[in-house]
C-alpha cells in the first residue's frame, strides 16, 4: 500500500521527530511511503485570515502535488480537515472542485488511517506511565475523528490513559487566534493546563502539533513536569 505523506508546516519546521515517527510507524505496518518535496502549506492560515485568493493558489498547488496519490496521510487533524474543505473552497469552479474532491476523498489523519483503513488497533508500542489525551477541535468537530487516538493508545503496553477534564474545550491555539486574541488564548490554555495537572498524568498526548506547542509552551513556562508528545511519537515508542 502506497502512502503519500503530507508532513505539515509545523512538523517540518519545529517537530521533525513527529514526521520521522509517522513514517516509521507506517512502514512497520507495511506501507510504502512517498514524500513529494513539492508540498507546501495546505493554505489554512491564509484562508482563515481572509486571504482567500492567496490560499487558493497554495491549495491548487497542493491538489496538483497530491492528486495522483493512492492515500494521503498527515499527522495533523487540522491540516487533514483543511484538505477536506478544498471542495467547498472551489465550489464555484467545477474543474478545481472535482480535482479537490478527488484529493479530499483519499486524505486521512494519521490515527484515522491506521484504524479505519489499515484496520489496526495495536501497533506494538510500549510506554510506561500515565497519559491523558487532548482532543483538538478541528480533528474532532470538523473531521469527525474522535475515537481512533484512544483506541490506539489503549493498546500501548504499560500506558494508563486517564480522561482529561473538560476535554471538549479548546486549548486556545486556533492558529492566528492565539496571536490576535492573546489575553483570551492565555486564559484558555491556562485552564487546559489545570485540567492536565488534575489527571496526574506523566504525558499529555495529542494529534496536532499546533495544540501541543501551545499547551507544551505553557506547561514549560509554569514549570510543570508533564511531557508533551505527539501520538505518532507514542506509537513509535518501544520503552
Curated annotation (Swiss-Prot):
What's this protein's family per the entry? Belongs to the LutA/YkgE family.
GO BP terms in the entry: lactate metabolic process
HAMAP family tied to this protein: LutA
Which is an annotated Pfam family here?
CCG
Q: What does this protein do?
A: Is involved in L-lactate degradation and allows cells to grow with lactate as the sole carbon source.
A GO term from the CC aspect: cytosol
Reading the lineage from the top rank, the first entry is Bacteria
Query: In the UniProt record, what gene is named as encoding this protein?
Result: lutA2
Query: GO molecular function: any one?
Result: oxidoreductase activity
The identity of this protein, by name, is: Lactate utilization protein A 2
